[in-house]
From Swiss-Prot:
Pfam family, one: LysE
Localization in the cell: Cell inner membrane
The protein's role, per its UniProt record: Involved in the export of arginine. Important to control the intracellular level of arginine and the correct balance between arginine and lysine.
The keyword NADP is assigned to this record: no
Keywords tagged on the record: Amino-acid transport, Cell inner membrane, Cell membrane, Membrane, Transmembrane, Transmembrane helix, Transport
Protein name: Arginine exporter protein ArgO
Topology in the lipid bilayer: Multi-pass membrane protein
Sequence similarity: Belongs to the LysE/ArgO transporter (TC 2.A.75) family.
Membrane-spanning parts: 1-21, 37-57, 68-88, 111-131, 147-167, 179-199
Recorded GO MF terms: L-arginine transmembrane transporter activity
Organism: Salmonella schwarzengrund (strain CVM19633)
Keyword Membrane carried by entry: yes
GO terms under cellular component: plasma membrane
Length: 211
């Protein structure tokens, strides 16, 4: 059964490594050393819920509800555009240190709310956990399925805590105005690229619904 665990671990790692809103947010909180371990834990726990739901039957709900899929997609597009705009606005600020200081003033609950939005309003999360993991894990018998799910969940915990701790460790180098500007530009551009990609998928979903 351990082979199913490592299959899940490898697949989970491959899906979580690319830069996305979740990873960008965890990285930024790590650089600021601001609730970064709490955010890593909440991201991992969110993945635990989503992965479990996808592998143990939740994928059917999303696949059988095209309107729900379209709603999730366009909600994600709106959020990613807003998130990317915020990152680019900070990067282009004439006083980057002042803009960064304003971000640092954010309270714990606002940071948690942003993390929840970054995770739960990201359509790629549902496609990865419900569609990809759901289709693969759903074909397994119950015992292998549990080991497969445990592997993918382990990948999330290892990655988010590793990313948060690494970013915090590199914070002295990454907190400079130049590094922050580059990071924010990179995050903003990536968020907008993902948003435009999702918008194309959203148009395809809407076209399928009305034809």
């Amino acid at each position: 059964m351990i082979s199913y665990y490592f299959q899940g671990l490898a697949l989970g790692a491959a899906m979580i490594l690319p830069l996305g809103p979740q990873n960008a947010f965890v990285m930024n909180q790590g650089i600021r050393r601001q609730y970064h371990l709490m955010i890593a834990l909440l991201c991992a726990l969110s993945d635990l819920v989503l992965i479990s739901a996808g592998i143990f039957g939740g994928s059917a709900l999303l696949m059988q509800s095209p309107w729900l899929l379209a709603l999730v997609t366009w909600g994600g597009v709106a959020f990613l555009l807003w998130y990317g705009f915020g990152a680019l606005k900070t990067a282009m600020s004439s006083n980057l240190e002042l803009a960064s200081a304003e971000v640092m003033k954010q309270g714990r609950w606002k940071i948690i709310a942003t993390m929840l939005a970054v995770t739960w309003l990201n359509p790629h999360v549902y496609l990865d956990t419900f569609v990809v993991l759901g289709s693969l894990g759903g074909q397994l018998a119950m015992e292998p399925k549990r080991w497969f799910a445990l592997g993918t969940i382990s990948a999330s915990f290892l990655w988010f805590f590793g990313l948060a701790l690494l970013a915090a460790w590199l914070a002295p180098r990454l907190r400079t105005a130049k590094a922050q500007r580059i990071i924010n530009i990179l995050v903003g551009v990536v968020m907008w690229l993902i948003a435009f990609q999702l918008a194309r998928e959203g148009v395809a979903h809407m076209h399928a619904l009305f034809n």
